[in-house]
Every structure is written in structure tokens, then in C-alpha cells.
């Protein structure tokens, strides 16, 4: 209604023509200079105020806006089903994925297949250990055994000498013990040949003690 009034005002029609457009001819409201809004039950003395009310504040305008909103919502709902139909192809892959869900147990056979592999690895571990043991035993055969025998031969000879129950003298340290047991303990833990065989103490008879000359300090005389 307000748009029609504005269009007529722009075309140059007077307020009387606008008033006649709002009210049918012969109505009592058309006689008065003012105007009455029947939707809001308000009477205006100035027709311009009535136009402003109709344009901005009338409840019929809000009702028209609500009806327009309802129409827009109806259009949106009418347009919504095609969207749902358009989205249905996207939903179909989901349904296909859901239908393909029974194929999810496929990893289970893979898992079961992996379990025998783990068992096989566990079975192979003793074989690997046996192989390593056999290789180590082969390494310890002729060459390794000779190396070990060669490394233990000096200690074996020393132990053979230490096993003599009459031996109580340590040549490396030049110490004689009263008991053979003390000699054995000395050779096992404290002997210098055990730490460094080359570092043997010199015999007392061969080593000669050379005393150093004593140096005397000369005092300066205070009175010269």
C-alpha cells in the first residue's frame, strides 16, 4: 500500500487522490482532512503523518513483512527437496560404505595371517640362536681354542708354580711368607706381577742404595 502511495505522490497526484485510494468513495473518513488507520485504530489530523505512519509504523506493514517471510520460508522449503535429492547421490556412497562394512572383517584374516608370522618368527628365534651358538662354537674351534689356550697358558704355568705347597717366596716382590696360604693370597690379590708383570721390584741384593750428599747453606755475615 505504501509503495503505491509513494508512486502516486511521485507522479504528482495530490493527497486527495491518495486518500481516495485508501478509502472507498462515500466513506466518512474521506470527508475529513486527516486520516484514520483502521489496523492501528489511530486518527491523524495531518495526512502526511498518516502517510509516515503507514510507511514506517503501521502494524499492517509488519504483517506484510511476516507474510513475506512466510512466503520466503515456503520457497526455501520448496527448494529444499531438490537439494536433498541432489545430496542423495552423496548419501548413496555412504550407504554403499555402510553396506561394504561387512568387508571390514577383512583385516581380521590379515591379522590372523600376521599372527602365524609372529609365531613363525618365534619359532625361528631358537634356530637363529642355534645358528649363532654353532657359529660361536665353530669360531671357538681350532683358532679360538688356540687363542684361549695361548692366553691362559702363562696363568696356567704361574698357577702350577703357585700350587707348590713348599713355595713361600715371591720373587717379583722379594717377600718371603711364613705360610703357603699367605703366599697364595698375596699372589692372587697383591702381587706386583698381577697388575703389571713387567713392573717387578728389584732384588735387595742387586739394588744399591746411593746416599745423596748433604748440602749446607752458607750464611752471610752481617759485618764484613
From Swiss-Prot:
Keywords: Activator, DNA-binding, Metal-binding, Nucleus, Repeat, Repressor, Transcription, Transcription regulation, Zinc, Zinc-finger. InterPro entries: FOG (IPR039746), ZF_CCHC_FOG (IPR034731), Znf_C2H2_sf (IPR036236). A zinc finger (CCHC FOG-type) spans 29-62, 162-195. It comes from the Eukaryota. Residues 1-24, 81-165, 196-224 are annotated as: Disordered. It is found in: Nucleus. Its main location: nucleus. Zn(2+) 2 binds at residues 170, 173, 186, 191. Disulfide bonds: none annotated. Residues 81-103, 148-158 have a biased composition (Low complexity). This is Zinc finger protein ZFPM1. Residues 117-128 have a biased composition (Basic and acidic residues). PROSITE patterns: ZF_CCHC_FOG (PS51810). One of its GO terms (biological process) is heart development. Residues 215-224 have a biased composition (Basic residues). One of its GO terms (cellular component) is nucleus.
Amino acid at each position: 500500500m505504501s509503495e503505491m502511495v509513494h508512486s502516486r505522490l511521485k507522479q504528482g497526484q495530490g493527497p486527495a487522490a491518495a486518500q481516495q485510494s485508501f478509502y472507498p468513495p462515500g466513506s466518512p473518513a474521506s470527508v475529513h482532512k486527516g486520516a484514520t488507520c483502521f489496523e492501528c485504530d489511530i486518527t491523524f489530523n495531518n495526512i502526511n503523518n498518516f502517510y509516515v505512519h503507514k510507511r514506517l509504523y503501521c502494524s499492517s506493514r509488519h504483517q506484510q513483512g511476516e507474510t513475506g517471510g512466510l512466503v520466503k520460508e515456503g520457497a526455501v522449503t520448496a527448494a529444499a527437496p531438490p537439494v536433498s535429492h541432489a545430496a542423495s547421490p552423496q548419501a548413496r556412497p555412504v550407504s554403499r560404505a555402510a553396506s561394504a562394512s561387512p568387508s571390514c572383517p577383512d583385516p581380521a584374516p590379515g591379522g590372523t595371517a600376521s599372527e602365524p608370522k609372529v609365531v613363525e618368527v618365534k619359532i625361528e628365534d631358537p634356530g637363529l640362536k642355534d645358528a649363532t651358538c654353532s657359529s660361536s662354537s665353530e669360531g671357538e674351534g681350532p683358532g679360538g681354542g688356540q687363542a684361549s689356550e695361548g692366553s691362559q697358558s702363562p696363568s696356567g704355568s704361574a698357577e702350577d708354580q703357585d700350587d707348590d705347597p713348599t713355595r713361600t717366596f715371591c720373587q717379583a716382590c722379594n717377600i718371603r711368607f711364613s705360610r703357603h696360604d699367605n703366599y697364595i693370597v698375596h699372589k692372587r690379590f697383591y702381587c706386583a706381577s698381577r697388575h703389571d708383570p713387567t713392573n717387578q721390584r728389584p732384588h735387595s741384593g742387586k739394588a744399591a742404595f746411593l746416599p745423596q750428599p748433604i748440602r749446607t747453606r752458607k750464611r752471610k755475615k752481617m759485618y764484613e
